[in-house]
Amino acid sequence: MGTMIVDSGISVDNADPEVQEQKTSLHSSRSRLKGTVQVVEFVIGDELFAVDLFDTREVITTPEVTSIPNAPTFITGMIDLRGVITIIIDLRIMMNIAKESSGKKKSRIIVLDKTVSDKMIGILVDDVYSVTNYSKEDIDQEAHSSAEGHRDILGVIRKSKKDAEGKEKSSLVIWLDIRKMIGRIEKDL
């Protein structure tokens, strides 16, 4: 599967939906065998989140967004993305995250794959960090399951990296079930 950079972001080649579905299915099978997961990592407020790479199409810088009258508060508006009207959802509002990002604001839109919804949808986030592979051993899929209201979380990823001094630093990345989240609000779109 080819990936390319678009507007300082990531794009997954989706020329033919049927071929893309076969590629996604094939890759998912390979990932399960290898025991790895590919995610797009992003930040909202000061928290790290991730969505499955194959639920995304591309990442773009935030263009001017046209408001939609009487839309739910989490719908920021719509954009014209190369001739296709794309609805923009503010994930901060949808997930009730009040805290603003403490870093420089470089908001991005993650455009979701056509397999996620019948409509073209983009999710507004504070910044996109990377596309990362994680071993399934790095993912805790049980920690969140007992908590009420966490049905949109696929797991919690333990991310380790070395800081400038060479010390091991770890953080948690919340792996979102973006398909379930969009499915729940699709009637409002």
Where are these regions (language model features)?
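An acidic, low-aromatic, low-complexity terminal/linker signal
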Residues: M1-L189
